[in-house]
């Protein structure tokens, strides 16, 4: 995935200091070393963990959130979050395939974005991927109909939702 993203972004010029780092985030020792190094090198960081959180358990997500919030220069964090409803649907549709690849979707907290409050992260904004895809005309006709339905406020519960969330520490 990182090779694909690097290829797409290779000619782009970021408007800030940008680093893409390959690291097995399940290696806690290496992760903590990296966080310390980055915190020492920057004054104000936006951490992006696209595609990561859904593979974690609730406990791992909490640990990760605490570790990030303990660094005073990690001001913002952006990642994609799924609702329990979407997790159930994805497990039903893709579960066997994911298990074959030793990848299991696990994290979709019942309390939604509020899960992260107790770990030092305040949700600033959440954008539905479905609604955003409709706005930029990236959906087929059937999905456009789904995008027209209103979404619940607060925790999404059994409603199938995924979005990108921006948090502040």
Features from the language model and the residues they span:
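Alpha-helical subdomain
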Residues: 1-169
